[in-house]
Amino acid sequence: MKIAVTADPHLNNNSYHIQDSDSGLYIKSIDAIRAFEWFGDEAINRKVDRIVVVGDVYHHPDTTELIRTRLNKVLQKLAGEGIQVVIMAGNHDFCSRYHALQSLVGWNKHIKILDKPFVETGVATYVPHTMDIECERTDFREVIKGLPTADSKNHVFFGHFAVRGALRDNLSREESGNAVSATDIEGTGATVAFLGHFHKYQRIKGNIPIFYTGSIENHRMDDMDGKRGFFIYDTDTGEYERVDYENCRPMHSIEVEDFDSAMLILRDGDWESSIVRLSAVGEHSDYLDIRNKMMELKRLFSAAGGAYIFCRDKTAAVDPKGSKIEIESIEKINVLETLKAEIDERIPDDEECSLTKDLLEEVHAEEKSK
């Protein structure tokens, strides 16, 4: 049996909060659903017998009807070709004891929704993000150790959780002592494992091949350097292959010293459909200058076909030579910096943290101009 494996589609991804004027969807949602539609077509073209989605079909459980409709069209197309579909619940699919995949349960005989561990004798072990883990904080290691050991020659393991040593989405390493280890997965008797949860395509060190398949479409800036695609695994031969996706939206992170260097870079680049993050690394006064002139940068960027551009502060907190800061009252500076520090504490996701601070800066600038 040939199985096509993907993970973390996040079909209603709202990163950057940029809406398409025609559909009203966020553009990263459009990117995600297009990638999933491509995955479905590739599964059909490569004549697989089954697809497995290893969690996080959605970015959050409250999604739009348009996203559901496009997902259903992919599932109908696969069912029409006689391809089985197994969808595992991920942590982003859940809201307490409810998960957004429940509307698909019983929808078609070709589709199976898994929200609790399941061992398919002679084929595979599935460990989704479960209701118990969502509501009762059951340990994944306990769940895995309680599963029956596989006895088939080419037994595949699918799981949606963190594994020790894996690269997280923020590029740090998963070092938690409670995280599942490669040894835990090997103890199930599996001969290969495909995982979801972290979005980077990576192989975990161990005695069997253990992969995070990675999401097909980039989710955020930190994803952009990695390869994108999905796996095909043959349970008869134990062989697997990687199929690459070449149509990710361009995303660029660029360091700039000041406004003039930002203008120069934007004039010379190809920004068609791109999302660009400028990181101000000069003096803090230069960052403030960029922020004050951001509309000029946005007009230039938009004229070049760009989708979205924003700037983050990577300068020192205070510029002793910057007249703009010295003009401000110390109370206002302290309030702004205090709020930014609070945002750093409360929002663990780097990209969301940066965007929230950017919004705070914009609101602060607007209030000052009144």
Task: State each model region's role.
Residues 38-46, 74-77, 146, 265:
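A generic secondary-structure signal
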Residues 43-47, 149-153, 269-271:
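Glycine-rich phosphate-binding loop signature in dinucleotide/nucleotide-binding domains
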